[in-house]
Amino acid sequence: MKKAIAMCLIACMVMTGCGGSKGGAGEPQETVAGSDGQNVKIKDEIIFCQGNDLTTLDATIGQQERAYSISNNIFDPLFTYDSDMKMQPCLATEYEWADDTTLKLTLREGVKFHDGSDMNAEDVKFTLDLIDQRGALFVGNYDGCTIDDDYHVTVKLKAPNPAFLSILTLPQASVVPAEYDEAAFGANPIGTGPYKLKEAVEGDYYTLERFDDYWGGPAKTKLLTMKIVPEASQRTMMLETGEVDVAYEVPNNDISRIQENKDLQILTSPSMKIILMELNCSSDGPVGNPDVRKAVECAINKQTIVDSLLYGFGTVSDNIIPQSAQDYREYETNGYDPEKAKSLLAQAGYSDGIQLTLWTNSNQTNTEIAQVLQSQLAEVGINLNIVTQDDNTSFSLIEAGEDFDLMLDFWQTNTGHADYVFNGMLLSTSVNNFSRYYNPEFDEAYVKYASTGEGEEREALLKQLYDDMVTDTPIIGLYSETKVIAATSKLQGLMLSQIGAHEYQNAVVTED
């Protein structure tokens, strides 16, 4: 059952500016068409800023979203997603499932690494083996890769896994050269992307320069610089003064001011990130009771959070699977119902109310969410004590077995597939099962779901997984974040990514 991916779709999407991803840049340009149809000059450099520094430039090491706008422009994966989360070819041009556990890949020819060497099957095998050895990418059933010739490989799985292709879109699955040197690679990365590293000053800025031998054609802008600016209000100010062209993570209360400025623009995209609350299912206290966990969800008015704190830049979550993800299903959960919350508490033996503790970090939005939750839960008899501590402290305490009640957290479904959520957060064996959810029936249903192809059986298993999530309520999805980027009105061609891996190869900023 051969599945060749049509390249014409990519070409159309790039031309219309609605996505497309990776490639199609053509020759370097000095001018573009302006709003009046006349050619205008473009700047040699695009400067963007974000709040957090990078820990490494090595894309294959598990990283947070903060690294993606740099790493995704230095590296390429085998497959990628466009802005609508439709899978597109990248360094692999075709795939074929020879059987349920055998995947054959055809690789793109004529691809150069930044050091001038050719990308081939040896590099792909090395990369897949590398990320499997690290064991942090939910590769799961990977059972090795064999080289058929320079541009064909065969990947074996230990068991069927319909979600395996989505794993190959991860930034962490970007192809690196077989001569990879882990000790040096974090500071001197070598990829196949449209930009290569020019200069890096840790904690200050990172500058990339155009890679003229990029397989998709040279990027339109010569230089791309990311500045680290921790203070959110300063990022807005730098955009307003023209010191930067693009600002990430602008404060929600700055958005209306930016929208009113004719020299600036707000760009938005749906997101794979869900802001959520984890509930300790193994607690000896009240939250160990599923009726109490359901009562907590029924007490939360999620729409109020979106409207009052996010100024509408978010979508209420009916579960913890992003709406753009594969195998998302609209599903009735424990919706806002204060009277039902009181009834559930009484049913659990807590008609006089309870005291719970919520862990959160000091992020401004999280702090505000915690305060809203405190007010809403109080209305049904839940007295919420807020404890502010950094995320690493919370995670370390959980791993050490510390008892807790509730924790504000988030999960970004980077593969664009619901499997990433089930596998990553809800299995009893999941590294990130911070809710300490243990349900053997859920585990068994997941194992069958993960290895069952499309059809009625898989759909029935998926329904069971959703049923268990609602019945047991180990995690409450609050809202899906909208990606919001502020930019000069002279910016064109930036492709936003639902996981934050924004692509700049077709982006330009016009001059005055």
Spans of model-derived segments:
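Structural transition elements
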Residues: 311, 315-347, 365-366
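N-terminal lobe/hinge region of extracytoplasmic solute-binding protein
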Residues: 49-98, 190, 501
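Long beta-strand-rich cores associated with HINT superfamily self-processing modules
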Residues: 485-512
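Gly/Pro-rich hinge or "lid" segments in bacterial periplasmic/extracellular proteins
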Residues: 83-86, 169-219, 223, 339
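Ligand-site clamp/hinge motif
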Residues: 212-257
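Periplasmic-binding protein-like
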Residues: 283-324, 368-369, 469-477
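Extracytoplasmic/peripheral linker and loop segments enriched in polar/acidic and small residues
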Residues: 385-394, 420-489, 512
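Surface-exposed binding/hinge segments that line
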Residues: 96-100, 137-178
